[in-house]
């Protein structure tokens, strides 16, 4: 499975590590992804998703049904 949030689509960012002598080397800044089991009340079941921590915070205010609809995800497949 890829390192990508299943609800927001958040993924790694290309950046540079800059040393004291200003030598720049490429580095990936990965999203903070967590496996999270979320209760889906409409489906009456637990859904296990790989979510960014930002998405977990947004879930608490919006709810899983609204976020899944916005992302175009069918929760029955999880």
Swiss-Prot record:
Q: Which domain of life is it from?
A: Bacteria
Name of one Pfam family that matches:
Ribosomal_L28
List where this protein forms a coiled coil. none
Q: Which GO terms describe its molecular function?
A: structural constituent of ribosome
Q: Name one GO cellular component term.
A: ribosome
Q: Which keywords annotate this record?
A: Ribonucleoprotein, Ribosomal protein
Give me any GO biological process, just one.
translation
Task: List, alphabetically, the InterPro entries matched.
Answer: Ribosomal_bL28, Ribosomal_bL28/bL31-like_sf, Ribosomal_bL28_bact-type, Ribosomal_bL28_sf
Tell me the protein family, please: Belongs to the bacterial ribosomal protein bL28 family.
- What is this protein called in UniProt? Large ribosomal subunit protein bL28
| Organism this protein belongs to | Trichodesmium erythraeum (strain IMS101)
Q: Which gene encodes it?
A: rpmB
């Amino acid at each position: 499975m890829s390192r990508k949030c299943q609800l927001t689509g958040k993924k790694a960012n290309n950046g540079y590590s800059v040393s004291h002598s200003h030598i720049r080397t490429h580095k990936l800044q990965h999203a903070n992804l967590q496996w999270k089991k979320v209760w889906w009340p409409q489906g009456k079941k637990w859904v296990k998703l790989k979510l960014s921590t930002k998405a977990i915070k947004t879930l608490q205010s919006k709810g899983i049904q609204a976020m899944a609809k916005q992302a175009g995800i069918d929760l029955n497949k999880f």
